[in-house]
Amino acid sequence: MKIHILKLIFLGFVLFVACSKEKTLAPTVDDQKLEQLGKEIQEFAKNKACSNEDDCRTMAMGSKACGGPSSYIIYALSRTNEKQLAEKVKQYTDFQKELNIKYNRASDCLFLSPPTVDCLNGVCASK
C-alpha cells in the first residue's frame, strides 16, 4: 500500500514538473518575438542625425502590465518615416499587452516619463 501511494505521489510530481516546463517554454518564444520586434524598431529608427533640437522626437513604446509605456524610442523626424515607426511601435505595444495578459505578468507600475531630447553633436539623444 505504501509503495502504491509513493508511486502516485511520484507520478503526480513528474506530471507537475512536466506541465510547469511547458508553460515556461512558451513565454520564452513569445519574449524572443517581442525582443525581435524591438530590435527591428531600433534598427528602423537608428539614423538619429539632426541639425537642430526640433528634429528630435520621442515615441512611447511597449506596455507595462499595470499600464503606461515600458520605454521610449528617440528618433530624428527628418530621418525616420514617423507613420511607419508608429505602426511598428503599435504592433510591439499591442503584442506586449497581449503577453502581459496571456502570462499574467506584473510590473513595477512606476510612471515612465518621456526623456528630454536634444540634438547633441548632430545626433538626437536624451539630455
What are these regions (language model features)?
Residues 15-18:
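C-terminal motif of bacterial Sec signal peptides marking the signal peptidase cleavage site
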Residues 37-71:
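Post-signal-peptide N-terminal segment of Sec-exported extracytoplasmic proteins
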Residues 57-94:
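Mature extracytoplasmic domains of secretory-pathway proteins
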Residues 24-43, 97:
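Short, charged low-complexity linear segments at domain edges
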Residues 3-11:
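Sec-dependent signal peptide recognition
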